Regions:
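Hydrophobic, aromatic-lined core segments that form the binding pocket/scaffold
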Residues: 88-91, 96
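Acidic/glycine-enriched edge-of-secondary-structure segments
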Residues: 2-9, 95-106
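A short, basic N-terminal segment
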Residues: 1-33, 38, 48-58
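Short loop/turn segments at strand-loop or loop-helix junctions that form parts
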Residues: 35-36, 97-100, 127-131
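Glycine-rich phosphate-binding P-loop
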Residues: 33-50, 66-82
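Residue-level preference for the first positions of well-ordered beta-strands
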Residues: 30-33, 59-61, 124-125, 155-157
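Conserved active-site beta-strand-loop modules that form the wall/rim of enzyme catalytic pockets
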Residues: 93, 116, 124-126
Length: 181
């Protein structure tokens, strides 16, 4: 019989999965930490992963169930946690945050599966962006990947994915003002 999930305030998101996996005392029993996501939570997590996958020029559309999304998220954050635990900590730097780890060049993909996100290392990356990617944390993941490349002095081209009318709606939204609201 499986243990009851720990109830946390607010929706489950990739960041909350990460926080749970980062706690050594809780990491042993991920099923207890994460529990089953609601339909809304599964949809949000899917949007986050889809946005990140588009950034890598890949698709996660074949993944249909919430369980599969959670599994991918776990794999991704296990990789992040391994890097996080290997980092030297000082009082000045503290523990690396999720945002910092997403920028780490050692974080190359969500999973070894071919269809998962890869952090674009090419000199020029084309990020395919759909309307769903402009909402919530999915958009912030895209922004983080974009910022990382800008700091490395690499060219990033944002392309709308979908119909012609999406093109004008998507590209202006990536101005910095959009993210400060």
């Amino acid at each position: 019989m499986s243990p009851d999930p720990i109830h946390r305030k607010g929706r489950k998101t990739l960041a909350k999965v990460y926080d749970s996996l980062s706690d050594p005392e809780e990491a042993a029993d991920r099923s207890r930490i994460i529990g089953l996501p609601t339909k809304k939570e599964a949809h949000d997590i899917r949007n986050e992963l889809t946005a990140a996958a588009w950034a890598g020029g890949k698709s996660v559309s074949r993944i249909r169930t919430a369980k599969e999304y959670i599994s991918i998220a776990e794999s991704f954050f296990r990789k992040l946690r391994a890097i996080k635990n290997a980092e030297q900590r000082t009082p000045q730097t503290g523990i690396p945050t999720l945002r910092e780890l997403l920028r780490d060049t050692r974080v190359t993909n969500l999973d070894e599966c071919e269809r998962m996100i890869e952090t674009a290392r090419a000199d020029t990356a084309i990020l395919l962006v759909g309307r769903k990617d402009l909402r919530g944390r999915g958009a912030r993941i895209l922004l983080t990947l974009n910022e990382t490349r800008l700091k490395m002095g690499k060219t990033t081209i944002l392309l709308a994915h979908g119909t012609e009318k999406d093109y004008k709606a998507v590209l202006p939204a990536y101005k910095p003002k959009f993210y400060r609201r």
